[in-house]
Design a protein with these regions (language model features):
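Structural microenvironment flanking redox-active thiols in thiol-disulfide oxidoreductases
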Residues: 93-155
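N-terminal "domain-start" segment that seeds a small globular fold
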Residues: 35-69, 94, 101
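Bacterial N-terminal signal peptides that target proteins for export
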Residues: 1-11
Length: 251
C-alpha cells in the first residue's frame, strides 16, 4: 500500500463523557465550523455522523451485520485498513494491539471498541477478515468490517479519508498471505485514526505513520512487511501517532 501522504480510555478511574485529547493538519477530519481545538497531538472536535451513514450495513469478521449506530454507547477507535497492506496497516495493528492491552488492563474493554474498516471490500471478505483476526489473536472488542463498495465509499467519504485502487508493479508482485497467489492490485489510502464518542459523534482524529515506540508488529504480519514497511517501523517520522496518543484521547 503506497500511502497518501496527507489527510485533512478510558484509562482512568472515571469514564469521562466528553472525550478530549490532543493536532495534525490535513484534509481528513472536521470542517472549520467544528471549531476543533488542537492540543499536543491529534485534533479534538465534535461532529455528528450523517444519519444515512450511521445506518449503513457492514459485515464483521464473524459474518454479523453491523452499523455505526449499533455501536452507540461504546467509545470507538476507528481506522481504515486493508488486510493485504505491507507498509502501514501492520504497524497500525501493532498499535491497536497495544491499545487493546491497555484497555484490558484498565478494566474497560466492555466500553471500548477498536474498529478497522477496509478500503478493499473486493478482497476483504468476512471469511478473510475472520482469518486475519484469528491470526492477530484479536480480542472480541477488536472488530474488522467490510461491506459493499458503495457502503465503504460512503463511509470514508463521510470521514474525509481518500483511497484509490492502483495496479501492482509487474516486477514486484507480492503474494497474498492467505491464498498464496500473486496480487494484481493495491489500494493507496490515507492513514487516519478517529475516536467516536458514545453518542456516535466524531470526537478526535490523528494521522500519519504509527509509531510503535519500540513495540513489535504482530508476529503474523512481520514477515509480510515490505522494504517500505520495515523502514516505516524503524523510522516512523515526525508526523506519527502512538498508542499513548489514542489512549489519552479516551480519557
Amino acid at each position: 500500500m503506497r500511502r497518501f501522504r496527507s489527510v485533512g480510555l478510558v484509562l482512568g478511574v472515571v469514564l469521562f463523557a466528553v472525550l478530549s485529547a490532543c493536532s495534525s493538519s490535513g484534509t481528513a477530519g472536521p470542517p472549520a465550523a467544528s471549531s476543533p481545538t488542537s492540543p499536543a497531538t491529534g485534533t479534538v472536535f465534535d461532529k455528528a455522523i450523517s444519519p444515512a451513514v450511521a445506518v449503513l450495513p457492514f459485515v464483521n469478521q464473524d459474518g454479523h451485520t453491523m452499523t455505526l449506530d449499533s455501536l452507540k454507547g461504546q467509545t470507538v477507535v476507528l481506522t481504515d485498513f486493508l488486510s493485504l497492506c505491507q507498509e502501514i496497516c501492520p504497524l497500525t495493528a501493532g498499535n491497536f494491539e497495544q491499545i487493546a492491552e491497555k484497555v484490558k488492563a484498565s478494566g474497560v474493554s466492555s466500553k471500548i471498541t477498536l474498529l478497522e474498516v477496509t478500503v478493499d471490500p473486493a478482497r476483504d471478505t468476512p471469511a478473510r477478515l475472520k482469518v486475519y483476526s484469528a491470526n492477530l489473536g484479536a480480542p472480541v472488542n477488536w472488530q474488522f468490517w467490510t461491506g459493499s463498495p458503495a457502503t465503504i465509499a460512503a463511509l470514508w467519504a463521510e470521514m474525509g479519508v481518500a483511497y484509490e485502487k492502483v495496479g501492482e508493479d509487474p516486477g514486484e508482485r507480492p503474494i497474498d498471505w492467505w491464498t498464496g497467489k500473486a496480487l494484481t492490485y493495491d489500494v493507496n489510502h490515507q492513514d487516519v485514526v478517529f475516536v467516536l464518542g458514545a453518542d456516535g459523534h466524531e470526537k478526535w482524529l490523528t494521522q500519519g505513520n504509527p509509531n510503535l515506540q519500540g513495540g513489535s508488529v504482530p508476529a503474523f504480519l512481520v514477515a509480510y512487511l515490505n522494504a517500505n514497511g520495515r523502514a516505516n517501523l524503524a523510522s516512523p517520522g515526525v508526523q506519527s501517532w502512538t498508542s499513548n496518543d489514542v489512549t489519552a484521547a479516551l480519557t
